[in-house]
């Protein structure tokens, strides 16, 4: 129970940190997708904490109730799902899954990435056409992954596939509209949505042009001639004359 409480606290802090780092601009909703990765960060924090030294926590296996998930159960009971009150992010229903993949250099094209997404899901469903129907979103810019409407049991099988980095319960990027974000994927066709794409070129502000003072460019320089009447040239020899 202590570990569960710690993970909840860490999740809350991570969500606040990730959301605050993106609140400066509402025009880039893709940045809020970082909150999706709070759960694997919790796992990394937990694993790094236990590797620093002995940490003994009295626990017992659970098959239901708060804090239980078949994802962490070696012998899962798929009929027992965690209560929705324990879900931290809106949209997490353990039916919509975010599958994040990693690609080696040289980085493949967008089309090659999407084909890889379909191939990955096909390997567990056994049918390419069925896989195309189950994929509801794809992304090749902000992150490399896709959203799939599959069971929790199948999500565990996907997690074991090569090239799969994370498999997480998906969450809304646009909570009021219940939108998971990314480019839509409908029957094998990609429907681009620029508002969910984030690139360095888009994020970088253009450098301001140098400013010039037009008044200085158009102002005529007045050259003043020396006045002959006011100041007469001085003969150096006059300073050497003896005084009378």
From Swiss-Prot:
Residues 60-80 have a biased composition (Polar residues). GO terms for biological process: cytidine to uridine editing; mitochondrial mRNA modification; mitochondrial RNA modification; mRNA processing. Keywords: Mitochondrion, mRNA processing, Transit peptide. Its main location: mitochondrion. GO terms for molecular function: cobalt ion binding; protein dimerization activity. GO terms for cellular component: mitochondrion. Residues 59-82, 196-244 are annotated as: Disordered. It is found in: Mitochondrion. Disruption phenotype: Retarded growth. Residues 1-62 form a transit peptide. This is Multiple organellar RNA editing factor 3, mitochondrial.
């Amino acid at each position: 129970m202590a570990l569960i409480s710690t993970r909840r606290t860490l999740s809350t802090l991570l969500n606040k940190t990730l959301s605050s780092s993106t609140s400066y601009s509402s025009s880039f909703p893709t940045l809020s997708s970082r909150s999706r990765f709070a759960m694997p960060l919790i796992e990394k924090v937990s694993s790094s904490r236990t590797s620093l030294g002995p940490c003994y926590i009295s626990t017992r296996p659970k098959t239901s109730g708060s804090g239980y998930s078949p994802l962490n159960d070696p012998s899962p009971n798929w009929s027992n799902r965690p209560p929705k009150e324990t879900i931290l992010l809106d949209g997490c229903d353990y039916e919509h899954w975010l599958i994040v993949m990693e690609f080696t250099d040289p980085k493949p094209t967008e089309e090659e990435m999407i084909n890889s997404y379909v191939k990955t899901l096909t390997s567990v469903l056994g049918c390419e056409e069925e896989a195309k129907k189950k994929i509801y979103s794809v992304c090749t810019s902000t992150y490399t992954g896709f959203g799939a409407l599959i069971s929790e049991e199948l999500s565990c099988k996907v997690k074991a596939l090569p090239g799969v980095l994370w498999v997480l319960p998906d969450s809304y990027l646009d909570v009021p509209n219940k939108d998971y974000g990314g480019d839509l994927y409908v029957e094998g066709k990609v429907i681009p949505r620029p508002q969910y794409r984030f690139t360095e070129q888009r994020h970088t502000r253009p450098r301001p042009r140098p400013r010039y003072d037009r008044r200085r460019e158009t102002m005529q320089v007045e050259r003043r001639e020396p006045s002959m009447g006011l100041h007469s040239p001085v003969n150096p020899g006059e300073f050497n004359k003896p005084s009378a």
